A protein has these predicted regions:
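Polytopic transmembrane helical bundles with strong interfacial aromatic enrichment
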Residues: 4-7, 31, 124, 161-163, ...
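Residue-level recognition of alpha-helical structural elements
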Residues: 24, 28, 50-53, 57, ...
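A structural-propensity feature for long, helix-poor, extended segments
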Residues: 49-88
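Amphipathic alpha-helical interface segments
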Residues: 79-149, 154-155, 161
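Short, hydrophobic/aliphatic alpha-helical segments
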Residues: 4-22
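Conserved phosphate/anionic-ligand binding catalytic regions in large, soluble enzymes, centered on
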Residues: 18-39, 136-153
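C-terminal auxiliary extensions adjacent to catalytic cores
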Residues: 154-192
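Amphipathic alpha-helix face/heptad-repeat signature
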Residues: 31-35, 57, 64-71, 107-117, ...
Length: 192
């Protein structure tokens, strides 16, 4: 299969809309975070006169963009494992249940990472919106809002997968913290 990143945008959008399980909500969420990080990187590059660390901000945004983009495929793989595990016949030894649980743990971990990335991107976007090149403020504000939406969507996916698997742990709480941070950054970006 061709990487989602090697496809034209139109083809990726067609795949999202197709009657297939992936890319779905997780892939769209990761792509949204990647787009937000790209906007931060661009705005930072145009803000060298206003921000002494603009180059570092752009470099960090690029790292987050690349990682978020990788998560598009990782989410599709994780969801594929969930579907494969659910398709297994029930067995007395509980192998299917164990495989379903393991698959759902990974399916929750991927969007959790998305929440963390999105919160970082939103914070960076708010900083660039407030102190960067004023001509790029719209791009920075858009990045912050997109990142906050990505964090919220990813946190919902974490909650769904944790509930479906009856998983314990603190992933939902940590995802909710990332959403709160991303929302606060987006509000800061729009208020500056």
């Amino acid at each position: 299969m061709t990487s989602f990143l090697d496809q034209p945008v139109g083809q990726f959008l067609d795949q999202v809309a197709a009657r297939s399980p992936a890319p779905g909500g997780g892939g769209a969420t990761a792509m949204t975070a990647a787009l937000a990080a790209g906007l931060v990187a661009m705005a930072a590059r145009f803000s060298a006169a206003q921000l002494p660390d603009a180059e570092d901000l752009a470099a960090r945004a690029d790292q987050l963009r690349c990682r978020a983009a990788e998560l598009v495929a990782e989410d599709a793989q994780a969801y594929g494992r969930v579907l494969d595990a659910f398709a297994l016949p029930r067995d007395a030894e509980g192998v299917r249940d164990r495989l379903v649980r393991e698959a759902l743990e990974r399916a929750a971990a991927v969007p959790h990472e998305m929440t963390e990335i999105a919160a970082q991107v939103a914070a960076m976007a708010a900083r660039v919106a407030g102190a960067g090149n004023p001509n790029l403020r719209g791009d920075s504000v858009s990045a912050a809002i997109l990142a906050a939406a990505s964090a919220r969507s990813a946190a919902c996916l974490v909650d769904i997968n944790v509930a479906l698997g009856g998983l314990g742990g603190d992933l939902p709480a940590r995802a909710a913290q990332a959403v709160a941070a991303a929302d606060a950054a987006a509000q800061q970006a729009t208020a500056t």
